[in-house]
Structures are given as C-alpha cells and as structure tokens.
Amino acid sequence: MSTSDDIHNTTATGKCPFHQGGHDQSAGAGTTTRDWWPNQLRVDLLNQHSNRSNPLGEDFDYRKEFSKLDYYGLKKDLKALLTESQPWWPADWGSYAGLFIRMAWHGAGTYRSIDGRGGAGRGQQRFAPLNSWPDNVSLDKARRLLWPIKQKYGQKISWADLFILAGNVALENSGFRTFGFGAGREDVWEPDLDVNWGDEKAWLTHRHPEALAKAPLGATEMGLIYVNPEGPDHSGEPLSAAAAIRATFGNMGMNDEETVALIAGGHTLGKTHGAGPTSNVGPDPEAAPIEEQGLGWASTYGSGVGADAITSGLEVVWTQTPTQWSNYFFENLFKYEWVQTRSPAGAIQFEAVDAPEIIPDPFDPSKKRKPTMLVTDLTLRFDPEFEKISRRFLNDPQAFNEAFARAWFKLTHRDMGPKSRYIGPEVPKEDLIWQDPLPQPIYNPTEQDIIDLKFAIADSGLSVSELVSVAWASASTFRGGDKRGGANGARLALMPQRDWDVNAAAVRALPVLEKIQKESGKASLADIIVLAGVVGVEKAASAAGLSIHVPFAPGRVDARQDQTDIEMFELLEPIADGFRNYRARLDVSTTESLLIDKAQQLTLTAPEMTALVGGMRVLGANFDSSKNGVFTDRVGVLSNDFFVNLLDMRYEWKATDESKELFEGRDRETGEVKYTASRADLVFGSNSVLRAVAEVYASSDAHEKFVKDFVAAWVKVMNLDRFDLL
C-alpha cells in the first residue's frame, strides 16, 4: 500500500505517481459504463458496421469488383487446393473436402428464420464468437488454407462468398452435382453485435427444445451450430434427439425432408476427429497467445495433427468412400446393427457391431475400421417420421441427391434475400418459394404518370396519418439480417400481412389505393402504396411551412399469393414496432430495447431512428390511432413538436400502472394531464445518448433540419428492398 511519502518521493523525481503501478492504461480499459449499468440500452447496436471500420472505403462496389473475377479460374484453384495437403494440417485421405463442407455448413448454419440474423452472408465466421465456438474447432485451419486463394483474387471475391463456394467446389470435386451458386455476400469488418446467441455464461450449456421455440436461438447448446451430436445433454439416446433436431433445423426454415437430406449429405464425406482426450487441446483462437497468429486449439496429443487430430472429440467415419459421393450413409445406417461405444476421447458414439472393417483409415492405407455413426445420425433410423424419409432415400438415391442439392442451396443462400441479389454465372434459373419471388415488372410509369397518381392520392380523402401509416406498414417489414420483407411486392395486401393486428388501421386505406391502381393502370399497387407515403409526407411538410420533394423511385411489382409462403411471412410479424407505438407482448424484453431491435433490422442509425419516431408521432401514425407520444396540437403537420414538448420541464411523467408501459405527462403547476406516452416515446428523453440527439431536433433552429432528416430516413426505409437501385 502506497503512503504519502511514496507519493512525495515519486513526485520529487519528476515521475507521475499514478503511472507506476500495474494498472492497464490502454484505451477502453477499466470498469466500463456497462459494468455499472448492465441493463443500459444498446443504442450502440445502431452504429456497427460503419465505414469507420471498413478498410475498402464507402465507394467500394463489390458487385462491380466481382464482375472482374475469373470465376472458373477461381473454382479451378479451389479444386486444386482440395488435394494439396499441407504438413501443418494434413488432409484426411488427401482431401480437404469434408473440412471445407463443414466450414461452409457451419458458416451458413447460424441462420435463424425467426429474426433473420446469423448466416453466412457477412463472413462472420472470421470473428468472435463464431471463430472460437466449440463447434467450430479446426475451422480456423480451413480458413487459413483458403488464404493464398483469397490473397490471389483480392477484393474480387469476398471471404463470405469464398467460404460457401469452397463448400460447393468440395462437393462437386467429390462427384456431387450441386444446385448452383449465387455470389453477392459482402464482407463486414467487425463482429455482429446484434445477434442474440443466448444468455448462458458457459459453453455447451444445454437448452430444452421447447425453449428454442420461444427464442431466436438456433442451437440446443451455447456454442453449437445445431444439436449435441452425442444426444441431448450427452444422453447418448438417438430417439430423444429427434425433438432437438426438429427444433433447430425448423428454426432455419427446414422441414423434415430437408433435415434428413442435410444431415445425411453432410455426413457422406469426411470424418470427425477425436484421436485423444480433449484435455490436450489448447485455447481457442480468441484466447490463444499472440504468436499463434489467429489460430487456436493447438494440441499436445502426439503430433497434434493428421492421425492425432482432435476436434469434436468424436472419432466417426460414416462411409466407405469418404472423399467420393455415395449412398453409403443410408446403406450403412439400415444394413447394420449399432451399439453404443466411446471414442478415444471418451465421447459417446455408435459402431456397427456386425459390420466388417470396410472403412479406410485417413492416413494409413493398410488399416481399416468398422463404420461408425453419431448418436444423432441414428435418429434418422429410429424416429418414425425421419425413418420413412431415410428409407425412401435409401431406395432412391437420385431422390436423395436432388433433395440434398436443393437443401444445401437453401442452407447456404437462405440469408441472402431475393434472387435479384445473386450474382455470378451459376445462379439457378428456377424461382424458389423461400426466396420470396417476385414477378417481372409490367408497369413503367412516366414522370407525368407519377404526377397524376400523386394528385389522385391527394384527392382520395385519405388523411396524412392514413397515407403515412399504409406506406410504413408495407415497407417496415424489411429485415437487414436476411433481406426479407419490404414494400416491393405489396404483400401488405396479401395473407398473412393484411390480417396482422399491427396493420389493422393501415389496411383500411388499401381499398382506396387499389381503386386508384385499377383505374389508372399506370403503376403497381406496391408503387402506389409507397407513393401514398410520399404524398402524406409532402402534405405534412407543406402544412408546416416547408416545400419539400420526397424522392420516389418507381419499379416495384405486385407479388401473388402463390408466391408468398404464409408460414415464413408470419415470422415477419412484429411483436413490437416502436415507430407505430405497437407492442403485442410484454414478456419479451423492454419496449425501448425492441425499438432498438426494430431500428437495427431497418439498418437505421440512432439519429435516423430518432427523426422517424418524432415524425411518425406528429403525423399521427400510431397503429391504433392512439394519442400516446403525440406531443402536438397540430396532428398531420411535420413539426419538431415531439421533441420540443418531450424535453419541456413544465411536464412531469408518471406511470399509469405497475407495468410502467404507459405514462401521463402532467403540468407541474396545475396537475392537468397534457400528454400520454409509451416507453418508446419517453426513452428519447431518458436515455442520455438519444436525448442528445433529441435536443438537436428540439432546438429553435432545427425544424428544417429535422424535416430533411426525416425525409431522408423515410426514403431509406421505403427503398430498403430496392436492390435493383444499387
């Protein structure tokens, strides 16, 4: 413990007394704000993936750069790489096919259809936590093997595209015909902060399958891609794993047939690695020492590589031809009887007790072994529904090949959005229902057509609130994670969206707009819905004394009901939309956190979110036409009244009940209730970051800036799914 003499002595020498200890003096060290207030609102989620972290700069155009790529030259190089075994990570049977397939699968397999997050679309496997997940052991080696190819082709191919293409080439080089490949995944340069991987604090914590249905989680254990291959909570029971398998694959939007095809197809090639106890394996890449240079899981068991490799701790080879495509997975599954055993690492697996030694050793041609399977592989035989599908694939290998090709394509492209985002020479021509297909455009409105339509909308009798509400309801379904939803397609007029509670008021405007569309015959309903919002915003700005032009880009089309997967679109129904002051359930997070979640899905910044909420309130765009947050006496006028009155100290706020979801703003002197508000309103005065933005818009000189910012953010949301404008 230092004394005053110590301080005096160091001061006398000219040294700062506070720089002598062992405290971390680096930027960001020390107790953080979140340490003090762990429930602090995550406004920072709206700032991720900015150009400040992008070394390529904001002018970089990946689609343009990809067009310069020697695509088939790249595939040729990948094919050669598959059999160029490296001494620092030798290839099993001289082929990296199984490793690259696993890399692609585990990159894409983090996708969750419930919120559209995860997936392979951003190359997130390069970053924590995914680069160090227990289920991704040794995939650091796969990515490092790809580096010379990435280095050669530079920015003409993103890491995200390269990971998936490498998996495709691995399948093709093993004799399998894939369904196709669509490029277009753009890299990001930092980890996704918005993905909820779960609340557990320890790796491989077990989750009950029923819990997965209530949360946007894609795995039964923290740190796994899908399920524990040893059965739920290491139970070793194939039948009990069925529920977990259905839950996890179902959360990706896969049905039973796709699930069986993916498991069997993924386990037709390659092997698992469990040569010895996992206690020999060192820290993951994020925890490894600096000299490991981004690699992790260094093993001290034997050579640590090749025949001595330890990955999952399981030691399983499924087929007689682990580098060539076959139907041996199903043949072995049903031909032999299986007994539970353990790998050299002690992991639970199964061995074909009555089989001869027909499986080749990956490194010693003189050795053979019996077929082995994972606990979850046997689920495909013992679960009644999975068994029916598996036996059909056993007897019809072509049906299996077709099912796997389509399921693999879906797995690896599910988070890319509509097919219009795909680029490259191997994009399949067929439209698939999970791509949310759209018809070809049939309208090409001229500038005069648009002017005429705007007059018709303005004279329709619809209020500013109705015009703005219907446009927002159509466009705000967009999800930045998987690029689903949005105004293109006018699916607001179709099932299930037209029946959502949140859209009850908005859809009342649809018959009027549908009539205008039918009578004019000049534009799609999708365009007219967005144009209605344009008219509403321009009228509201004019009423506020500002003449503005809201940009509008025609070209949207109208989807048909048969192009709309109702079950998958049900997942886009919001449990909350703070922009419309809507909340369906109170058992999920806080209202203000759900507002941030919605804004993040809409790819909004904090200022954009703030401007939109403030504008939506004064335009009277609440889903139920309530007065919550409508801090103005001139509804329908695009003013900054929301911010002015929210920050006015004449009013004090009190919750109306114990839920503290709704509040009354009373005059401090008279006690009169002046306004009512939700948490999605008051957060702009309570949260220090959002209040700082709100203060800008509440200033006396901010009205014109606010209107311009609102219009810019509004147009951004309306065009989020206009990939044709990129």
UniProtKB/Swiss-Prot annotation:
Keyword Oxidoreductase: yes
Alphabetical keyword list: Heme, Hydrogen peroxide, Iron, Metal-binding, Oxidoreductase, Peroxidase
CDD domains from the UniProt entry: catalase_peroxidase_2
InterPro entries named in the record: Catalase_peroxidase, Haem_peroxidase, Haem_peroxidase_sf, Peroxidases_AS, Peroxidases_heam-ligand_BS
Record location of the Tryptophyl-tyrosyl-methioninium (Trp-Tyr) (with M-252) cross-link: 105-226
Catalysed conversion reaction: H2O2 + AH2 = A + 2 H2O; 2 H2O2 = O2 + 2 H2O
Cross-link (Tryptophyl-tyrosyl-methioninium (Tyr-Met) (with W-105)): 226-252
GO MF annotation list: catalase activity; heme binding; metal ion binding
Family the UniProt entry places it in: Belongs to the peroxidase family. Peroxidase/catalase subfamily.
Protein name per Swiss-Prot or TrEMBL: Catalase-peroxidase
Organism: Shigella boydii serotype 4 (strain Sb227)
Organism placement in taxonomy: Bacteria, Pseudomonadati, Pseudomonadota, Gammaproteobacteria, Enterobacterales
